[in-house]
């Protein structure tokens, strides 16, 4: 990659050189296909200008799926077809999350802290898990959260709204690794993680992942995806990763798709509800329901109001929502929520 440090892998190359002395063949392996920074991968060699990784053999996800040693994932990215951002008296409208983010009117972190957005994504993830459990009753779900506070809120949301069990594991827990080991053989439905369940964790019954991390590097995204790819007992086990249609995550998903076998895709829109987003702290949005649609009006107020349910919109953010169902999708699916 361009800008790769010329000194970052000197110790690795020295080690390979020492091992190679007197040996006709030397095999060096790496599970790291690239790094997001400029650091070279240890024990690997680079050539060319700009410096690129030298490989004699590459075994990717597509190979693993075709060899039936990994599950074939569904990558489901949830989007919005009608986003309204109100700044004081001016309203900006966008037809996608990408458009709103690129216009610098919406931040990815806004989606990760907005209760209604999280509720809709988690509801979709829950429905995916229910669908998979029709044939695989021990399947479980993973939520990769962006903060400890968010993780606790999501865990409570799962317990309260889905009547399912949930456990939180985070980097600040003394017994986090023990809790992960217990989860592997338990009947707990969901595990919500902050900086714990990523690289190297082996929990084959995980078949659904809700990606709600603030980290948007391709290596981390693929590492998280790997948590739901591990074959359990059967080779026909489905798995799904659900995330917001943030530009970088779309790019990574499309790259993963290029390596996967082709398959069919079906999308069905079940329901549409309209929300607005306002950034004016002196106003709040109030909703009314008519014929299964939510209509919005903005009312001046000197007080702050917070709502928790879908039909009482939180003041800080809201946007168009559709409930969608995608079955047997093995290609990246960008759905309008």
Model regions and ranges:
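A short beta-strand-to-loop transition that corresponds to the Sensor-1 phosphate-sensing loop
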Residues: 29-33, 147, 194-196, 245-246
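Interdomain helical connector at the RecA1-RecA2 junction of SF1/SF2 helicase-like NTPases
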Residues: 38-138
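Switch/connector loops and helix/strand junctions flanking conserved nucleotide-binding motifs
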Residues: 4-6, 35-40, 73, 84-86, ...
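SF2 helicase catalytic motif II
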Residues: 1-28, 32
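Conserved RecA-like P-loop NTPase helicase motor core
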Residues: 165, 170-270
């Amino acid at each position: 990659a361009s800008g790769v440090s010329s000194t970052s892998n000197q110790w690795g190359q020295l080690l390979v050189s020492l091992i190679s002395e007197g040996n006709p063949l030397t095999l060096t392996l790496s599970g790291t296909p690239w790094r997001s920074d400029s650091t070279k991968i240890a024990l690997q060699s680079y050539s060319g200008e700009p410096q690129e990784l030298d490989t004699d053999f590459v075994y990717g996800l597509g190979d693993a799926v075709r060899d039936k040693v990994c599950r074939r994932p569904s990558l489901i990215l949830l989007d919005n077809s009608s986003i309204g951002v109100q700044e004081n008296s001016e309203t900006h409208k966008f037809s996608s999350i990408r458009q709103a983010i690129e216009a610098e009117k919406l931040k990815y972190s806004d989606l990760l802290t907005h209760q209604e957005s999280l509720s809709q994504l988690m509801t979709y993830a829950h429905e995916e898990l229910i669908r998979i459990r029709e044939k695989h009753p021990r399947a479980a779900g993973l939520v990769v959260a962006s903060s400890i506070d968010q993780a606790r809120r999501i865990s409570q949301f799962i317990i309260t709204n889905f009547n399912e069990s949930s456990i939180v594991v985070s980097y600040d827990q003394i017994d986090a690794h023990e809790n992960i080991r217990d989860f592997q053989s338990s009947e707990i439905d969901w595990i919500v993680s902050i900086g714990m369940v990523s690289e190297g964790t082996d929990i084959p019954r995980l078949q659904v992942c809700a990606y709600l991390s603030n980290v948007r590097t391709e290596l981390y995204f693929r590492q998280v995806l790997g948590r739901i790819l591990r074959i359990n007992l059967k080779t026909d086990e489905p798995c799904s990763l659900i995330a917001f249609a943030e530009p970088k995550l779309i790019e990574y998903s499309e790259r993963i798709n290029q390596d996967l076998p082709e398959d069919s895709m079906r999308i069905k829109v079940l329901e549409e509800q309209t929300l607005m987003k306002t950034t004016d702290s002196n106003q709040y949005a109030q909703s009314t329901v008519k014929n299964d649609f939510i209509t919005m009006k903005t009312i001046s107020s000197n007080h702050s109001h917070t709502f928790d349910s879908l039909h009482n919109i939180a003041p800080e953010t809201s946007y168009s929502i559709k409930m969608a169902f995608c079955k047997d999708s093995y290609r990246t699916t960008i759905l309008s929520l």
